[in-house]
């Protein structure tokens, strides 16, 4: 299906000023984006989105916001990187039950985000978002 690529291409062809004007369409006094505002905005921007397209796009925005909030919660120092120190004290049920040590659980958690080319014991926001975006497809 080439429709999503064509829509993305149309957005990009509008340049920065087009994207800025699209952003203005979504701003109201609540500083939140409703599904109705998104639908109206993409229509005014000249994009032909079906209701299903708008629903999918809105759902993707909501998922990303939830993942970003989870990362922010884990990043205790606010430096944009989750380390063992950040997640100490966030106990798994296995630790509480004595089935695993805190260190084992922390290592297992961090290893979920490591690639064969990058084993540093840290999780960046990009790694966190990439991991969870892959799970929700």
Swiss-Prot record:
Residues 27-48, 62-97, 100-135 form the EF-hand domain. It comes from the Eukaryota. PROSITE patterns: EF_HAND_2. GO terms for molecular function: calcium ion binding. Disulfide bonds: none annotated. InterPro entries: Ca-bind_SignalingProt, EF-hand-dom_pair, EF_hand_dom. Keywords: Calcium, Disulfide bond, Metal-binding, Repeat. SUPFAM superfamilies: EF-hand. Possibly acts as a regulatory protein and not as a calcium buffer or transport protein. Monomer or disulfide-linked dimers. This protein binds calcium. This is Crustacean calcium-binding protein 23. It comes from Homarus americanus.
